[in-house]
A protein has these predicted regions:
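Extreme N-terminal starter segment of soluble prokaryotic enzymes
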Residues: 1-5
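Generic enzyme active-site microenvironment
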Residues: 8
């Protein structure tokens, strides 16, 4: 085989994992829940075996979609071995490197980040301070703290249930290049805490109408060992 395409529909689950409750995801079955609430027209995916894979995973047919039909692809349903539920864990495992050690997570406290981390980030990046320092929804926190950020120049830092350190900043007032440089510094600092990703969350727009832009960038820890893509030793083109 001279060329292969690996397509990932991230977060489109076809059945809940046995440990879903551990992560607050009991009852998760994303594709089934979507199919139960609206009509899906996905003939090509069904021919490739998506419906059959969903049935294999949960023992139930997808609502509103044919339970049988001609399948032109090979299909299967896998159960994740990795200890985490985040994006890098799943992607690495699909590439042959499951994550068998726990990621570092930040507590649901305010502040949620240790002072040694935030103090070092402020000093290294010459910042006037930080806003947020909590668990939050990305869209909600820019609506809440966006004005204070623009006025003060303090970036917004927050986390979630995943192993992430997220930094939001206004593309015009703070600058996209400066935000990305800040995230590179943060990536170095959070390595000590075994955090999976630092995520740049740029936003734009006027007060009251802040919107996240498409310039998000993820800074992930490298896989702990070579993936299948490394072992194939070929040219890799990544999109997305």
């Amino acid at each position: 085989m001279s060329r292969a395409f690996v397509l990932v529909m991230d977060s489109l689950g076809i059945g809940g994992a046995a440990d879903a409750e551990k992560y607050g995801d009991a009852g998760a079955d994303t594709l089934r829940h979507i199919a139960a609430t609206r009509a899906l027209d996905i003939p090509n995916l069904m021919r490739l075996g998506l419906g059959a894979a969903a049935h294999l995973s949960s023992g139930k047919a997808l609502p509103g979609l044919p339970a049988s039909g001609k399948i032109s692809g090979a299909y299967g349903a896998a159960r994740e071995k990795s200890l985490g539920k985040d994006t890098p864990s799943g992607h690495w495992e699909m590439a042959g490197v499951p994550v068998m050690t726990e990621w570092g997570y930040f507590p649901r406290t305010e502040p949620c980040f240790p002072a040694t981390l935030t103090d070092a980030l402020i000093a290294r990046a010459d910042l006037p301070g930080l806003l947020g320092n909590c668990h939050a929804s990305g869209t909600e926190i820019i609506a809440k703290l966006g004005d204070a950020h623009v006025e003060s120049g303090k970036p917004i830092v927050y986390t979630s249930a995943d192993s992430v350190f997220q930094i939001a900043a206004h593309e015009e007032s703070f600058g996209l290049a400066r935000l990305l440089e800040l995230c590179e510094i943060a990536r170095e600092l959070v390595d000590t805490y075994n955090v999976g990703r630092v995520i740049a969350r740029p936003f734009d727009g006027p007060s009251g109408s802040y919107v996240r832009t498409g310039n998000r960038r993820d800074y992930s820890l490298p896989p702990p060992e070579p993936t299948l893509l490394d072992r194939f030793d070929g040219k890799t083109v990544s999109i997305g």
